[in-house]
A protein has these predicted regions:
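Catalytic alpha/beta active-site cores
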Residues: 1-214
Length: 215
C-alpha cells in the first residue's frame, strides 16, 4: 500500500531522511524512495537513524517501527520490529447489561471506568502467568514532519459511550416516591458530566478532536 520506487521492503537494510524525502537503502547497495513521495509524512528519532517512519495511505497513517535490539527487529535486515496501522474505528465503552452492570455497585464501577478514560488516568495491574502486567491508555505519538515541524497524532482510538435504553430502570437512584428512575437518564447524566473532563481538557489526554461528546 506504500510501495517503493524500486525494490521491496524485505530487502531494505536502512532508512534515512534527506530533506523532505525518505531514502531506503537496499541490500544490493542501491538506494530508493517511495513511489509516491507524498505518502511520506515524518519520522521519529534521528534523521540518519530513525526509530519510526510515518507514512500515509487513504488518509490513514502507518508507522514503521525500527529497533535492531528488539527480539523481532534483530531478525530483520533494517531492524523493523513492527508496523502500526491507524484505525478508523471507534471503541465502545458500555454501560449496558452486556458488562453485567445491573445494580448501584455495578454502575459505580462503570462510571468510575469512564471517568478514568476521560481523565486519561485509568490503569489496571494484573498477573498473567508469572508476570505482572499493567494496562493504561497509550500516550499521543510525536513525530518530526517532512517540513521539520512537530507533528502529534493521537495514541488512542476515539471512544464513545453506550448508555442503557430508556425502558430499563435501576435501583441506584430512587425518586421521592421510592420508585427506580429510568436507567438511561441516569447514564446520560453521569456520562455527560464525566465527559466534561475531555471537553474542558482537564485530563492527561484528549478523546475528541472536535470538542464533542460521543454517546
Amino acid at each position: 500500500i506504500v510501495p517503493l520506487e524500486s525494490g521491496v521492503y524485505e530487502d531494505a537494510i536502512s532508512f534515512m531522511i534527506l530533506g523532505e524525502s525518505l531514502q531506503v537503502e537496499l541490500s544490493d547497495g542501491t538506494r530508493t524512495e517511495l513511489k509516491d513521495t507524498n505518502q511520506y509524512i515524518g519520522f521519529s528519532g534521528d534523521n540518519n537513524n530513525p526509530s519510526g517512519i510515518l507514512l500515509k495511505n487513504n488518509n490513514l497513517h502507518l508507522e514503521i517501527q525500527i529497533d535492531k535490539d528488539h527480539n523481532i527487529g534483530m531478525d530483520d535486515l533494517a531492524g523493523i520490529k513492527d508496523v502500526l496501522v491507524e484505525s478508523a474505528i471507534t471503541t465502545i465503552q458500555d454501560c449496558d447489561d452486556s458488562v453485567a452492570a445491573v445494580d448501584a455497585a455495578d454502575k459505580v464501577i462503570v462510571y468510575r471506568n469512564w471517568l478514568g478514560l476521560m481523565k486519561g488516568d485509568l490503569k489496571e495491574t494484573f498477573m498473567k502467568g508469572d508476570f505482572e502486567m499493567t494496562r493504561s491508555l497509550n500516550p499521543d505519538r510525536t513525530f518530526t514532519s517532512k517540513d521539520n515541524k512537530e507533528l502529534t497524532l493521537p495514541g488512542r482510538s476515539l471512544m464513545l459511550v453506550r448508555n442503557v435504553g430508556h425502558l430499563m430502570t435501576n435501583s441506584a437512584v430512587l425518586d421521592k416516591n421510592g420508585n427506580e428512575i429510568p436507567e438511561g437518564i441516569l447514564d446520560a447524566m453521569f456520562t455527560i458530566c464525566i465527559s466534561k473532563h475531555d471537553l474542558e481538557k482537564t485530563g492527561n489526554y484528549s478523546n475528541s478532536r472536535k470538542g464533542s461528546i460521543y454517546i
